[in-house]
């Protein structure tokens, strides 16, 4: 199972992306505090969103508190020497303000409080599984035109 839940602040204005077929995307960074209780370290986590989720996040201002539900994905970076490296990011499926009753798409149906992990069942129907873990088509990253005007800012913040 690949599910990620983040709670934190939007660290900078999201970067807009657009695929060749016109799908809106956005990359941004979430400032999250370590909740283990051992230290107060901050992590700056790279997040990507697509479609309605991206439309929601590009309208947000830095510093706003957000709850992100998504999954870990990898992406490839080719440097100037034509060498490939890979990195992890979170791909957001849902984003909402913790104090509001609606998400970027619809009324909240699965929050941490009523998630399938809190009330486990011996078996679930296919419809229940699909609602808890919606399937999304894989994105063809070769057809994306990135606009990374804030990536330097992301690198500077993550060096803390």
Curated annotation (Swiss-Prot):
Official protein name in the record: Single-stranded DNA-binding protein
Cleavable signal peptide: none
GO biological process: DNA replication
Segments forming domain SSB: 1-99
Assigned keywords, A-Z: DNA-binding
InterPro entries xref list: NA-bd_OB-fold (IPR012340), Primosome_PriB/ssb (IPR000424), ssDNA-bd (IPR011344)
Source organism phylogeny: Bacteria, Bacillati, Mycoplasmatota, Mycoplasmoidales, Mycoplasmoidaceae
Molecular functions (GO terms): enzyme activator activity; single-stranded DNA binding
GO CC list: nucleoid
Subunit structure comment from the entry: Homotetramer.
Pfam (any one): SSB
Organism of origin: Mycoplasma genitalium (strain ATCC 33530 / DSM 19775 / NCTC 10195 / G37) (Mycoplasmoides genitalium)
């Amino acid at each position: 199972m690949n599910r990620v839940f983040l709670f934190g602040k939007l660290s900078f204005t999201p970067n807009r992306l657009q695929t060749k077929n016109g799908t809106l995307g956005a990359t941004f960074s979430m400032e999250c505090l370590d909740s283990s209780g051992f230290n107060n370290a901050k992590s700056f986590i790279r997040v990507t969103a697509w479609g309605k989720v991206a439309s929601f996040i590009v309208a947000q201002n830095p510093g706003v508190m957000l709850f992100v539900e998504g999954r870990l994905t990898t992406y490839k970076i080719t440097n100037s020497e034509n060498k490939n490296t890979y990195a992890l990011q979170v791909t957001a499926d849902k984003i909402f303000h913790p104090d509001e009753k609606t998400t970027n798409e619809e009324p909240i149906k699965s929050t941490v409080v009523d998630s399938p992990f809190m009330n486990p069942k011996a078996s679930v129907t296919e419809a229940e599984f699909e609602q808890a873990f919606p399937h999304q088509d894989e994105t063809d990253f070769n057809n994306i035109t990135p606009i990374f005007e804030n990536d330097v800012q992301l690198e500077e913040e993550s060096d803390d």
